[in-house]
């Protein structure tokens, strides 16, 4: 950043360089905090793990050290197979309900790869109608819609491709699974 750069940007594009740089830096700081919180949640998640394959009719049984892969032998479309992911999500949601005694999962965070599968499942409702003028853009995690009117779906481009984080967010502060409370906040 130089004074000349700021003057040129203002003269040619009518933009305030300081405001633009501050905005970008704020977004990056916000992204870092979001990723730190998501990492904390992924490491603390205790409802369990389910294994699922995107390959049609392929079952993976997680038996600890290594999974057993088997072909199921029934035939369906790829879209119908993608719907079986919903069963796995619901199973973990019910475990969360058992553990919290408050409710099942009501949000999920996934990678864009898993997001593509979820967006193709009947029951997914996108938050945007595709109008770029109405859309809001930011770095990192974005709410993209809901699944079956039950789960808010967030896409995280930095998330491991084959993982989904499910969580329950209650209506009160004490109904949360984690609290991010840094002793010295960023000024």
Task: Provide a role label for each language-model segment.
Residues 1-4, 10-13, 17-19, 23, ...:
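Sequence/fold signature of self-assembling virion shell proteins
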Residues 1-3, 14-91:
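Alpha-helical scaffold segments that mediate packing/assembly in large oligomeric complexes
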Residues 27, 104-108, 151-152, 163:
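Beta-sheet entry/capping signal
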Residues 34-38, 105-107, 117:
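Acidic/polar loop patches that form or flank catalytic/metal-binding clefts of enzymes
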Residues 50, 55-56, 66-69, 75, ...:
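Compositionally biased, intrinsically disordered low-complexity regions
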Residues 77-78, 101-106, 110, 119:
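Conserved P-loop NTPase motor cores
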Residues 96:
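Structured binding elements
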């Amino acid at each position: 950043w130089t004074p000349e750069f700021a003057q040129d940007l203002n003269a040619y594009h009518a933009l305030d360089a300081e405001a633009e740089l501050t905005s970008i830096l704020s977004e990056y700081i916000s992204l870092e905090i979001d990723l730190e919180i998501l990492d904390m949640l992924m490491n603390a998640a205790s409802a369990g793990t389910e294994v699922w394959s995107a390959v049609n009719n392929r079952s993976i049984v997680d038996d600890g050290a290594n999974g057993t892969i088997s072909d199921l032998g029934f035939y369906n479309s790829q879209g119908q197979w993608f719907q079986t992911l919903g069963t796995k999500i619901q199973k973990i949601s019910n475990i969360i309900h058992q553990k919290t005694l408050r409710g099942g999962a009501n949000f999920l965070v996934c990678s864009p790869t898993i997001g593509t599968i979820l967006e193709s499942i009947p029951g997914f409702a996108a938050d945007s109608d595709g109008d770029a003028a109405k859309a809001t853009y930011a770095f990192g995690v974005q709410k993209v819609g809901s699944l079956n009117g039950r789960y808010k779906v967030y896409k995280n481009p930095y998330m491991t491709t084959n993982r989904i984080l499910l969580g329950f967010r209650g209506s009160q502060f004490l109904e949360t699974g984690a609290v991010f409370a840094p002793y010295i906040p960023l000024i």
